[in-house]
Regions:
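Surface-exposed binding/hinge segments that line
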Residues: 84-88, 92, 126-168
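Append "and occasionally in soluble cytosolic enzymes with long acidic Gly/Pro-rich linkers
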Residues: 274-374
Length: 509
C-alpha cells in the first residue's frame, strides 16, 4: 500500500509538473524535465542581467554569448568573429555580420554596447568580474576598456550573464526578451518554460518546433516521468535510477566530467570553527571516496581541492588530508575537545561539539551527503544537526549554520579565477562563512593580473593548496553530469561547462 501511495503521489506531481501541453498535428515537440530550473536556482526567468537567469537563456536556446566554450573548455567565437587585445586593459571585438535578434533588429556594435552597459549596471558579479570602465561601438565592432587587467575577459564573456539581448525590447517581460538563439519564449512560469523555434535563426531552421522545459525537483518523479513517456529527456536524475536508462535499448545517456564540485564552507563566526584543528578534523572525518563510490554510484570522483584533475591547476596539484577518524579525534583532543561523559560525543567546558550542517534538497545528492556526513562525524565524536532546506538562503542570511554544503561549478570559465573571486576573497559575493586570509588575497590579486598561462596555472595551484592546507573549505567530490533521454532523441549532449543543452540540432523522431 505504501508503494502504491508513493506511485499515486508521483503521478500527481508528474501531472502538475509536466502540464498538458499537447502537440499540434505534425509539430515536433521536445519535453525536458530538470531540477535545475526554478526559483530556488535563481534562474526562473530569461533576463541574463538578473541573478542566474542567463543560465536559462543559454541552456534553453534563447540567447547566445559573444564567445562559447568548446569541449576542452577553451573559448571560441560565437556571436563574435574575432578579438584583439589593444593593450592589457582594452579588447576590440569584431562581431559577425547579418545576425538578427528575434525582434527583427540587427545585432550591431551599438546593440551589444547597450546590452553590456545594462549588464554591468545591474549584475554585481559581472561588474566585479569584467571591471568595465568604458564601451565604445562602431559598426560591427565593440571596444571594451577595463579598470584593471582582466586576462580572462574573453572567458568571462562566455558566462551566461554575457548573453546578448536586444535592449530595445526591455527585460521586464520574459516572453518579450529577444536573443539571437534558435528558440523564443512563448510562456514562462517558475515551474515551466515553453519555447517555439526561431524560423529566422541565422544558423539554420531548428529541427524541433516546440520545447517544453518542466521543473521537476523530486528525483523519483523525474525518473517516473521519463519512464512513462511524459518527458523525452531528463537532467539531474538520482544516480540509483540511471541504470534503468543505461541498460535499456529504449533510452540512451550522454555523460561528461565537469567542474561541478560538492563543497562545504565553514562559518568562521562559529567559535569552535575558528580553530583550524577543528576544521581539519571535520575534513578528515568526511569519507569522500565512499561518497563518490556509493552515494554518487561512481558518477563522480573524490575531490582534493576545488578543481577536478582534468584541469591543469587541479587534481594532483593539491594534496588533501585523507579520511582518518582516529586522527581527527586526536586533533579535537589537541584543541581541548574530548568525550568526558562517555556519550560518544566530544565536549569542552561542559558543552558538546554540535555543528549545524545546512544544505538544500533540489540537488538530489546533497541530502544524501548530509546524512552521510552526520554518520561520519558521529564516529569522530561531533554531533551534526542537518538541515536540508530550499529556504537555505534565509538561514545563511541569519547566520544560523556552521557548515554549508552545496554543489558549485568552480571553473565554468575554464579558469580558476571565477571560483576565487566569487568565494574566497573577503568581499566575495559567496564567501558565506567570512573566510579571510591576507596571503590568499595577495595571491589572488597576482593571479588576476597575470596573462601568462603557465604562471596563472602555478598561482591557481598555490591558492588551492593554501585553501586546502588551512582547511578553509571542505572539498568533497567532483560530479559527472549525465543526461538521459529516449533513444529517438538526437542532438542532445552533455557539455563540460553545463551551459549548453538545447540547440538547433535537437530533434526527436
Amino acid at each position: 500500500m505504501k508503494f502504491l501511495a508513493l506511485l499515486v503521489l508521483s503521478a500527481a506531481l508528474l501531472t502538475s509538473a509536466c502540464g498538458n501541453n499537447a502537440a499540434t498535428d505534425g509539430e515536433k515537440v521536445f519535453r525536458y524535465g530538470t531540477p535545475a530550473y526554478g526559483i530556488a536556482n535563481e534562474n526562473a526567468g530569461m533576463d541574463p542581467h538578473e541573478a542566474y537567469q542567463g543560465w536559462s537563456a543559454i541552456r534553453y536556446g534563447v540567447g547566445e554569448t559573444l564567445f562559447k566554450f568548446d569541449d576542452a573548455m577553451q573559448p571560441q567565437p560565437w556571436l563574435a568573429e574575432k578579438y584583439e587585445f589593444i593593450n592589457e586593459n582594452t579588447v576590440k571585438i569584431t562581431l559577425k555580420d547579418n545576425i538578427y535578434f528575434t525582434s527583427g533588429n540587427k545585432m550591431t556594435g551599438a546593440a551589444v554596447k547597450a546590452c553590456l552597459e545594462d549588464l554591468i549596471s545591474r549584475h554585481n558579479r559581472a561588474r566585479v568580474d569584467l571591471k568595465i570602465t568604458g564601451i565604445t561601438a562602431e559598426g560591427q565592432t565593440v571596444t571594451i576598456t577595463s579598470a584593471a587587467k582582466v586576462p580572462v575577459l574573453i572567458n568571462y564573456l562566455c558566462d551566461p550573464y554575457g548573453c546578448i539581448i536586444d535592449m530595445s525590447r526591455g527585460t521586464g517581460d520574459d516572453t518579450k526578451i529577444s536573443g539571437t538563439g534558435p528558440f523564443m519564449v512563448e510562456s514562462l512560469t517558475p515551474k515551466e518554460v515553453v519555447l517555439v523555434k526561431n524560423p529566422a535563426y541565422y544558423g539554420g531552421v531548428p529541427k524541433t518546433d516546440r520545447i517544453i522545459v518542466s521543473s521537476i525537483t523530486d528525483g523519483n518523479t523525474l525518473a517516473l516521468a521519463l519512464q512513462n513517456g511524459e518527458i523525452d529527456a531528463a537532467q539531474g536524475l538520482p544516480y540509483a535510477s540511471l541504470p534503468l536508462f543505461k541498460n535499456s535499448a529504449a533510452y540512451k545517456t550522454s555523460s561528461t566530467d565537469t567542474s561541478r564540485t560538492f563543497l562545504a564552507a565553514f562559518n568562521f563566526n562559529t567559535p569552535a570553527l575558528q580553530d583550524e584543528r577543528v576544521r581539519r578534523a571535520v575534513v578528515m572525518s568526511l569519507d569522500k571516496e565512499t561518497f563518490a563510490r556509493v552515494q554518487l554510484m561512481g558518477n563522480g570522483i573524490a575531490a582534493a581541492g576545488p578543481f577536478p584533475p582534468n584541469l591543469p591547476f587541479g587534481g594532483a596539484k593539491v594534496h588533501a588530508p585523507e579520511y582518518n577518524p582516529q586522527g581527527a579525534r586526536k586533533l579535537l583532543a589537541e584543541a581541548g575537545w574530548t568525550d568526558t561523559d562517555g556519550d560518544g560525543y566530544v565536549d569542552k567546558d561542559g558543552q558538546p561539539l554540535t555543528l549545524r550542517w545546512l544544505t538544500y534538497s533540489f540537488r538530489q545528492e546533497l541530502p544524501l551527503l548530509a546524512e552521510a556526513a552526520q554518520s561520519w562525524l558521529k564516529e569522530t565524536g561531533i554531533c551534526l544537526e542537518i538541515n536540508p532546506t530550499d529556504g537555505y538562503a534565509d538561514f545563511l542570511r541569519r547566520g544560523e549554520w556552521d557548515i554549508y554544503a552545496k554543489a558549485f561549478v568552480t571553473a565554468p570559465t575554464g579558469d580558476a579565477q571565477y571560483y576565487f573571486t566569487t568565494h574566497v576573497l573577503k568581499e566575495s559575493a559567496y564567501n558565506s562563512g567570512n573566510y579571510y586570509n591576507p596571503d590568499t588575497e595577495s595571491l589572488i590579486g597576482q593571479h588576476g593580473s597575470e596573462f601568462r598561462p603557465e604562471k596563472r596555472t602555478e598561482l591557481a595551484a598555490a591558492i588551492s593548496r593554501k585553501l586546502v592546507d588551512g582547511s578553509a573549505f571542505a572539498y568533497i567530490a567532483h560530479l559527472k553530469m549525465t543526461l538521459a533521454m529516449k533513444s529517438t532523441v538526437q542532438g542532445f549532449a552533455a557539455h563540460p561547462c553545463d551551459y549548453y543543452e538545447i540547440t538547433k540540432d535537437l530533434s526527436i523522431d
